[in-house]
Amino acid sequence: MSRVCQVTGKRPAVGNNRSHALNATRRRFLPNLHTHRFWVESENRFVTLRLTAKGMRIIDKKGIDAVLADIRARGEKI
């Protein structure tokens, strides 16, 4: 399963660990992903999404129906 938020599209970023001596070693910054079930009243069913904490806040703001419409417009199957 890929580490990509289904709402925001956020994916792992790359950067450096920096020690006290400023040695640089490569590392990955992973998104704060959660698997969450949402009740969709219009479809009378649960929908499971893999999303970041920011994606959950977007759903709180816009509503699950609007977010699902955006995801389906991108061609993702839900």
Swiss-Prot record:
SUPFAM superfamilies: L28p-like (SSF143800). One of its GO terms (cellular component) is cytosolic large ribosomal subunit. Keywords: Ribonucleoprotein, Ribosomal protein. One of its GO terms (molecular function) is structural constituent of ribosome. Disulfide bonds: none annotated. InterPro entries: Ribosomal_bL28, Ribosomal_bL28/bL31-like_sf, Ribosomal_bL28_bact-type, Ribosomal_bL28_sf. It comes from the Bacteria. Residues 1-20 are annotated as: Disordered. Pfam families: Ribosomal_L28 (PF00830). The keyword Ribonucleoprotein applies. Belongs to the bacterial ribosomal protein bL28 family. This is Large ribosomal subunit protein bL28. GO terms for biological process: translation.
